[in-house]
Amino acid sequence: MAEDVKAAMPQSILFQNEDRTVALIDVPRSIEEAQLLSSTEIISGVNSRRLVSSKPPDEPFRTPEPRNLIPNPDLAAAIADLTAAASIEQALKVLRDTYAGPWCLPRTLAPAEDVNGRKRKAAPAEEGNGVAERQGAASEPLIPEDSVYLQGTISAERARFLEEAPQFDLIVLDPPWPNRSARRKKDSYSTANNLDEIRETLSLIPIAAHLAPEGLVAIWVTNKPSVVELLTSARGLLSEWGLELIDEWTWLKVTTSGEPILDVNSAWRKPWERILIAKRRGSKRTKLPSQRKVLVSVPDLHSRKPNLRALFEDVFSPGYKGLEVFARNLTAGWWSWGDEALKFQQPEHWV
């Protein structure tokens, strides 16, 4: 029976091909499952609260293209975009050829608001989708089993981390990269003002001292060449941390019918984000079990990304030790660090 449970996929993984290079992930369910420690509970779905989410997009977003487009002078960035686009087209072909199910699971929706921000009744299209009633004043956050959190900035909590934190098999970072469009959005997460500021913050994280000898670091990055260069150049942060790149995953955002939410060939914005995966320099690990994985999801709220715990069980045994830096929710059995670590653990985000 234990073997059956181990072999079964979590409900959040709606599809995964045989070589595990393509995975369709339900973002809210991956975060819901991350609240649980027991693999039996995760697979069965029992005792799982539901996360309040946004309505999944049915149509691609329209974005204006620049009138006077200047060709990208960065050859490496142009090649990276072409490589990502080719991987995405292949992943979508795999899904369309072999998967006939839904592209996301039913969601628990927040109450709709009118243009003045006042709550109104759910629209007919939302009825029956598990529309959540917002709670009043926030009470105690919901803390998953065996999770540890450092609620505060990197500089404020660094001393405690150095004193108390163990070594981790996986360290996930979702840095607040400079992003003007995110800063313009209401209720958006805070971002760094510039790359110098975020580099200074990232340099404070003691990666080398707290990464297990054969551990991995997974870093969410935007598609800006300067962000990737900050990490991967000869004097970049990976070098500073004693790391070297071992793989790169792509997260593609799609509509409920499986169309990319933006034109793949758009010069302005891309429908994907990337995850750079690095190992210790000199590690015995040469590659991951599934190279250049493509994760496909219908997006949720702006700052939410799929929880990666289950996806790295291909690499580490279940129950491995993880840390998420710049976390916005907690994960059972993991450490979480950041000034928004409890953001989505507040009771009003759950039903």
Language model features with spans:
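Short helix-terminating capping/connector loops at secondary-structure junctions
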Residues: E164-A165, A209-E214
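Short, basic/hydrophobic alpha-helical segments
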Residues: E200-L211
